[in-house]
Design a protein with these regions (language model features):
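Phosphate/pyrophosphate-binding catalytic cores of soluble transferases and nucleic-acid-acting enzymes
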Residues: 1-147
Length: 147
């Protein structure tokens, strides 16, 4: 294995759905011994969908630290900007502990935001509220209409 600097290096594993990213990351983490796996999959941040999101099982995670998996209910708002703030913290904490951060997932927007940055567009509550109200109005009108 190539020399790895645990203070500065980050491994990123990306690929298509069901391509073996998680199992490869786990085997790499076990080989390195001082590593932490950090989620970069937009579906795996949610708690209510472990099968749908294919979150590694407890048995698969055994002996390897996993971060940013199953963070919050699928009904709660979560954005790439929120993930970016969290992943940067996790990477810094891992490096401070002398651990190799292994960022793994298939969400290109998450990975690109980590590698290239993202514009910090402020949330506009007025537009968000209007959009949510319009969605609720349209949704309820479709649900209530007879077939």
């Amino acid at each position: 294995m190539t020399n790895i600097n645990l203070a500065t290096d980050v491994v990123i594993i990306s690929g298509a759905t069901a391509s073996g990213k998680s199992s490869f990351a786990i085997s790499l983490a076990k080989k390195v011994k001082k590593a932490v796996i950090i989620n970069a999959d937009s579906a795996q941040v949610y708690t209510n969908a472990p099968i749908l999101a294919n979150i590694p099982t407890e048995a698969e995670r055994q002996g390897v630290s996993h971060k940013l998996f199953a963070l919050q209910p699928i009904t709660e708002y979560f954005s790439v900007m929120m993930w970016l703030q969290l992943v940067k913290q996790e990477i810094s904490q891992a490096q401070a502990k002398g651990m190799l951060p292994i960022v793994v997932g298939g969400s290109a927007m998450y990975l690109l935001s980590l590698l290239e940055g993202i514009s910090p567009i402020p949330s506009n509550i007025l537009y968000r509220t209007k959009a949510e109200n319009l969605y609720e109005k349209k949704r309820s009108s479709r649900v209530c209409q007879p077939c």
